[in-house]
Amino acid sequence: HARLAADETFTRRVAPTFRPDKYLEPAAGGWTGLLARLSEVSGCDATTLDGFTEAMENRRAYFKQLGAVSSDHSHRDLGTIILDHDRAASIFDASVAGWATVEEMTLLRRHLFTDQARMASEDGLTMTVHPAVYRNHDAAAFHRFGADIGSDVPVTLEVVDSL
């Protein structure tokens, strides 16, 4: 984005998009490593729920400062929930420690996703949601280009009750 913005021959506007998906997925491999990186770039301790929330707000502000107008979200479902802070913090801590159940991590993801909506209502980034996609299905493309490169395949999704 920065190179295109600095290129005087490129006359279109380029706006980055905030993509927090992988940081909201405690059940995904490598999540604690992502929290370490998030802590590093945000200057916040993202290994606690409060620190994670502060780090997310920090990164959203950073992207907005760079010209972002939206955040982009893609999860397996549209489930949303607002957990009591103590319950969410407890599940977050258990997820960091590696002993949260799959059910608890799903609740946490839904809570963190819902909190992104709160942040969007406060910072003005439009929340773009494209759920229910099967990613990385093409082994050759995955090995050549890496994870999450597009070519997603839609899967069945319940919408009304989730929201």
Where are these regions (language model features)?
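Histidine/acidic residue-rich metal-binding segments in metalloenzymes
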Residues: 2-13, 33-163
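Enzymes and membrane/adaptor proteins characterized by extended Gly/Ser/Thr/Asp/Glu-rich
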Residues: 19-39
